[in-house]
UniProtKB/Swiss-Prot annotation:
It comes from the Bacteria. Gene3D superfamilies: 1.20.5.1300, Nitrogenase molybdenum iron protein domain. PROSITE patterns: HISOL_DEHYDROGENASE. GO terms for biological process: L-histidine biosynthetic process. This is Histidinol dehydrogenase.
Amino acid sequence: MIKIRRLSSVDDHFQAELDQLLSFEVSVDSEIERTVTQILHQIRTHGDRALLELTRQFDNPDIDRIEEIELPRDEWQSALMSLDKVQREALEQAASRIRAYHEKQLAQSWDYVELDGTRLGQKITALDRVGLYVPGGKAAYPSSVLMNAIPARVAGVRELIMVTPTPKGEKNPLVLAAAAICEVDRVFTIGGAQAVAALAYGTTTVPKVDKIVGPGNAYVAAAKRHVFGTVGIDMLAGPSEILVICDGKTNPDWIAMDLFSQAEHDEQAQSILLCPDKAFLDRVADSISRLIDTLPRRDVIRSSLENRGALIHVRDLEEACMIANRIAPEHLELSVDEPEQWVDSIRHAGAIFLGRYTCEALGDYCAGPNHVLPTSGTARFSSPLGVYDFQKRTSLIQVSAAGASRLGETASILAKGEGLDAHARSAESRYQ
């Protein structure tokens, strides 16, 4: 029997218990920080030489020359052609759906002209070059390639550089095939903090990028945190999360599997169910105990559910939505009748999955919306990765002679009030 936490919103100490359940701090490992700082300094100071040494040390001891870290284009094209038909069609279908969704996000430049001829506007420009980090080896995720590369391509990014480690020379054909589908420009077989550093600072072989996106381990996350400001980054993601709001009418086995789908990521992942039906919570608990041993990652799931999972009894669905906003989850399932009527009640969530048939796993792979989502409550102020993350906005201002006179007088008054006489005189010079 798995020991998953049971809470009730009617209990006097519920808020404190909920706070404890949600409390999670990404501890800063001093050894990781020290190692990452050293690696960043090595790459910044010694470039390719350090990159080759670190790649030999951590990933592939058989690499002889720095030129070997770049994969020729025909190798990833070959990986795509070598996939069996079912896998290739699944990747291509997912890519097509992701592309179609993200094309709806594409922003356009705009402007307008005032009566005196003054023109104001906003220019949308794609980033020049983006670096995509993809974990390597057997645990690689081709879906992450699609979710990160396709929005960049839709945005109009000129050059997309992918880095992925190849432990002991092992390459993941699905990842390379995904790179081919997304028309990535260059692929380098490097990983870890050294790959992040190479992308951020540039070396003779690896070009400097404007932004780095993609998931990674603790060393990659620490490196991204350190280089932020030199380059942009997507986000600092915490453990994966799912919150399910259910009215008690869904198959409890479905709900159990939905909770498992996040719990299997790692021991720190969080899976929570909110329901006004106590008997249904009992049935889900039974399903969890019965089904968990059928899964290969059952030990990870068990640890996740026992440490950070919960089945919570609530008064009604309205209260469930209030609690959901308090949690601001990465993924939120509305497994209820007429889920549309509750959407406006949800203010804070990375993604909302409506209805009993809409499992979160579809969003991870092929529904279309991005699976790179804010975690750890940051959905209160953050959004999913999208086309807008690969575009910049530049203000446009053009005033006529009449506009210079009208606006110049206003600017002069305000500038003098701030004690900035040069500002005032600059504005005045256009109309005096």
